[in-house]
Amino acid sequence: MNASDLWNKSLDILSRREHSVIELKNKLIRFNPDPNDLKDVIERLITSNFLDDKRFASAFIRSKAESGYGPNYISQYLSKKGISSDKYDMYSLEIDWEEKCLAQFNKKRRNKEINFKEKEKILRFLAYRGFSYEIIKNALKEFD
């Protein structure tokens, strides 16, 4: 696959969803392992504004927050995808993390009374979903 085909393939991949630079490199390397072609295409995508780690991070954060994940989970996943924390600000996107946490809590408890053991189980679930202790504590003040 030459550089032109690699360019077209990368546009095809990016037309489906946002990707990080590292994520796209890993996908494209299967089609053309030549590092020079790959580097040229990636640089061209970045300068053409087709590929942007900040835009990817913002879209990813919004998507995962809407799916009920907390900031700790999201930042850990982004670092796995090669996005450094200086590329995004989790708290500048006007996401109410306490509201998201409370929504997940209510979804788990199904609007019924719960005992201490069930509450602890839900709190562990919320921590697993990436909500910090502080967010959980603030979101669930009314249930103490």
Identify the role of each PLM range.
Residues 1-144:
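An alpha-helical, amphipathic repeat domain used for nucleic-acid recognition
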